């Protein structure tokens, strides 16, 4: 018995030491947070994020901690939470709904809404997944109750506003995943009459922020479906402009074998960067027009073929990525020599970021 008592004392001593270390860790984290606030309090943008993190501490844990799912668990529940984690991952099985009575007399759109299974999502960290309630997608009563803002109580309205703010925070990063179900993939088991999803589907939302308007542009969407046999994703539908080779990017991601969520994110990131590149080119020319450096601006959808006027001189550019690779000056009014035209055309080639400076200096001598 003495050995058991010794072991029990050792365990209690270790637990006490662990608790002491955890308290020290929390104090250090608080000091670091206070120091960061003091150093960056002059920056209004940083202060806005700090206020947001204070309002949603789970978001702060999700972004800055390695294991946010354990931060919300008190000391007594840590060992229990770790013990509950299965040794092997549990395969995803969508919940089933019982077959409705008299469903044959329902309109098709109502039948789909009433019989589709609960939307499942596994794209978010477990620490915040419970905050993203998808019941509103499948429950008409909940959707009606949520959308009637005037009829809900103050506490419910505040809770709904918090959900909206949290969703907007995630969408700020430009790439978000969301769950959805294609009604075509809903099947009925002959024996039990239960509804199940034949294959998974994943939605990707891409939103590019415009610094010129301080707003997000119209979002683009990509829908992926899973192949039943190979369990890999394939490109189903998208709203990306045709000048971006979405299928080529998808086929080039991991050799065309997009299996995991990480693979899907890498594909989405490559498409997103091309959208950002197009928006950046458009923004540069729109800013030049707003500053009245150029006028009568004409852009194609890709913002690669560009024409504009500087005073009464027409300039045509061909832009690739962030570089001006071709320039033509078209003028029938001024008596320019071909040699001078060529010099000005060569001068405008190069980085798009230097275009404003070049226009101000290269063309200044023309109008003296």
UniProtKB/Swiss-Prot annotation:
GO terms for cellular component: COMA complex; kinetochore. GO terms for biological process: attachment of spindle microtubules to kinetochore; cell division; centromere complex assembly; establishment of mitotic sister chromatid cohesion; negative regulation of meiotic DNA double-strand break formation involved in reciprocal meiotic recombination; protein localization to chromosome, centromeric region. The keyword Nucleus applies. Keywords: Cell cycle, Cell division, Centromere, Chromosome, Coiled coil, Kinetochore, Meiosis, Mitosis, Nucleus, Phosphoprotein. Belongs to the CENP-O/MCM21 family. Component of the heterotetrameric kinetochore subcomplex COMA, which consists of AME1, CTF19, MCM21 and OKP1. The COMA subcomplex is part of a larger constitutive centromere-associated network (CCAN) (also known as central kinetochore CTF19 complex in yeast), which is composed of at least AME1, CHL4, CNN1, CTF3, CTF19, IML3, MCM16, MCM21, MCM22, MHF1, MHF2, MIF2, NKP1, NKP2, OKP1 and WIP1. COMA binds the centromeric nucleosome-binding protein MIF2, and to the outer kinetochore MIND subcomplex. This is Inner kinetochore subunit MCM21. The lineage of its organism: Eukaryota, Fungi, Dikarya, Ascomycota, Saccharomycotina. The gene is MCM21.
């Amino acid at each position: 018995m003495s050995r058991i008592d010794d072991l029990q004392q050792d365990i209690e001593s270790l637990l006490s030491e662990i608790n002491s270390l955890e308290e020290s860790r929390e104090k250090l984290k608080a000091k670091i947070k206070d120091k960061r606030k003091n150093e960056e309090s002059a920056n209004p943008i940083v202060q806005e994020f700090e206020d947001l993190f204070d309002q949603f501490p789970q978001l702060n844990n999700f972004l800055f901690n390695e294991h946010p799912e354990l931060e919300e668990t008190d000391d007594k529940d840590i060992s229990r939470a770790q013990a509950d984690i299965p040794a092997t991952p549990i395969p995803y099985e969508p919940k089933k709904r019982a077959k409705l009575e008299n469903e044959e007399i329902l309109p098709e759109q109502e039948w789909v809404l009433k019989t589709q299974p609960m939307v499942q999502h596994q794209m978010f960290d477990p620490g915040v997944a419970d905050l993203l309630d998808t019941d509103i997608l499948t429950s008409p009563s909940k959707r009606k109750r949520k959308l009637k803002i005037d009829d809900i109580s103050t506490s419910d309205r505040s809770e709904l506003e918090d959900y909206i703010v949290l969703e907007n925070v995630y969408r700020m990063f430009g790439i978000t995943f969301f769950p959805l179900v294609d009604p075509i993939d809903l099947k009925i088991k002959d024996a039990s009459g239960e509804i199940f999803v034949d294959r998974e589907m994943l939605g990707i939302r891409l939103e590019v922020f415009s610094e010129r308007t301080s707003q997000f542009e119209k979002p683009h969407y990509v829908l992926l479906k899973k192949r039943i046999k190979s369990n890999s994703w394939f490109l189903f539908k998208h709203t990306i402009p045709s000048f971006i080779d979405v299928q080529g990017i998808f086929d080039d991601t991991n050799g065309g074998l997009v299996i995991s969520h990480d693979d899907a994110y890498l594909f989405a990131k490559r498409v997103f960067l091309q959208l950002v590149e197009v928006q950046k080119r458009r923004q540069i020319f729109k800013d030049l027009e707003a500053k009245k450096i150029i006028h009568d601006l004409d852009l194609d959808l890709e913002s690669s073929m560009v024409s504009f006027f500087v005073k009464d001189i027409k300039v045509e550019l061909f832009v690739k990525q962030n570089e001006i690779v071709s320039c033509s000056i078209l003028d029938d009014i001024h008596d320019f020599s071909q040699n001078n035209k060529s010099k000005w055309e060569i001068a405008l080639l190069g980085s798009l970021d230097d275009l404003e400076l070049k226009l101000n200096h290269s063309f200044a001598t023309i109008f003296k």
